[in-house]
């Protein structure tokens, strides 16, 4: 993903703000083969039995005992102490406990019966397996330090070192640590300002480092928090917690390096194993074991619509049972093969996230855009690992694409937009309002589908032609015939599909403000369209732009076609309120207009709000009533300075006002 796209409105009241659409790509990197230690003995019910005792490495282990809530043990590295006291307190008491607590509540595992003791890293890349051997033996002994990502693993968490000169000459050195008790996963938390933290978009990253012997489940991992990206500001809380939850999930299982280790519901490997119990094919070039087609398969979309004709479009599908079931359920498409995986973004993003075009704000897509949710699809993925039983009650509702059918799920966004345009219908959840043409802003505010935020259509021109398979328009209003192939949504991972996206207001030398209605700090008293931000506010759309009038002059606020306003539900009726209003206005029916007229700072401000369905905002709504012809404020005279004994000053003031508007 490219960094933030900044633009500027040209209405004078927008000159003090710099609105920009924010995307934060995931910084995941699949750990190298040599950095992941397998075969950690976990000693379930048979403390001296090792899975290698089995003559058939593909047989089901006997320990299919009851599942219990996942227990994650946090171990803070000393690098955390380099953070400021305020940030350190936030990390230790809020950020990590909340992120970890979410997954502990969401997942159940086969519980560890004894303390986790991790393997030591070998000096060389050679090691020995031997029947009855409790631990993997190193060829030339063990390293002094064993790391997990950016963290040093304490000796107290490690097994002793088993080293062999040959299969019969083995000895144990070092001491066995006490291990980590009452835990199923150890998460080592670091705060190193590493090279990967140099990018302004990187907040944190994580990966697994060791897997247990019986079922191959990851049992240890590292999450590194980039110090310069940590913030205690309220506006940043959602994105920080969601990002850390996202990265932890990579360590728990959502990783291209773990797909070949998945198991079915009976505990049997989904991918064929060799006599050592490893997947049969190691892809050395890509750094992971290859999986069988019952996990991920390639599907060809042979008539993929583009603005320049149809092409063949290959996609990668996760086709495990629960994932397929949830994907079909979500879209309402019984012939969908599975859930599409990301095909853009480079190493660490491709195949390790859901496809952005198909699952826009699902938290396990490859870049954060807005309102991230962990849906049933991601929990189904975790169930299909064979390691977890998810609690589907914690799943959040994914509205993107919900029940939009097979055409939405299986065809290009360009075809969806094209067909809707022919039918004269809205292309939801896509859009076609151009944000800017490279020289001037054309942005128009709208409401998100959940009406919890303002949003802009992220359709922009690129400097180069888009890849042929992502040219989603035959033509665009106001764009020359050859220019459509340069236009696409600003989020490349979404196949350049344009959609409404939340944004931030960046004010010079001040904090960022974003477009969410619920945050009171996003508002500004007396601003042009008289908005009210706060926990009781939602987004309302306008039938036409607002105006400001004064001294015979008029300004049309054409960039605004939606705003945030206070609402309440009383006696089965939805009410909406604006800034500087003594009473709230009733919304008796969907699409009813509320007319607002206020004199603020010497200007007559006029605009109308479109009422949504009462049930969109209120849990209890009354029966329909006869709607009055007009609901809103009475007519007001346009203000202007009067000539009196201060007539010279009045004239001068009006002259200044005219100059200000012209500017």
Swiss-Prot record:
Pfam families: Peptidase_M8. Its cofactor is Zn(2+). GO terms for molecular function: metal ion binding; metalloendopeptidase activity; peptidase activity. Zn(2+) binds at residues 246, 250, 353. Gene3D superfamilies: 3.10.170.20, Leishmanolysin , domain 2 (3.90.132.10), Leishmanolysin domain 3 (2.10.55.10), Leishmanolysin domain 4 (2.30.34.10). Its EC number is 3.4.24.-. It is found in: Cytoplasm. This is Leishmanolysin-like peptidase.
